[in-house]
Amino acid sequence: LTQADFILTLLSVYWEEGRKEIEQFCIDSRKIPEKETRFSSFNYLIKPDPDDMLRVLVGLTFHRAKMKDVYSIIRGRDMETGEFSEELRTQQFDKLKLNLPTILDNTNWQSFLKVLIGGGYKDEELISSKNAVLYSYILYLIGKQNFNTQNHELQRIIGRWFVMSSLTGRY
């Protein structure tokens, strides 16, 4: 089992609705919507798994990439004292709940994917690293949410970031 599995289990215990929303988003990303009017997370570039979207949620919320650290954080561990607290766990889940709509927002998701398509990535076979896509999405959301970066500037920056992280394997 991976750290993401443990975190998803914690979500099932303390926030089942959040886990279900993440799973539904991932299911929808794999199938073409039945009606043209339905806005969907479907795309040809990446088919995210729940642990992938969890990584995005954690990256946006806690600005951390190591799932091991996140597991401790959402269990309610105070990183300074090492003590576990029910109150702290509740606060951490509240932070996750606040950011989940942002990462699952289809406008954000499709706008980000347009950045990759604009860079010449037309289908999944051209993507060499799923993690590069995920971390680029985290940076896209941080730029949009935390720094209020103009959309055209954000698209340019994230497009360059994705190409360089794909070429170098560093993100």
Predicted regions: what they are:
Residues 1-171:
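Flexible coil/loop and intrinsically disordered segments
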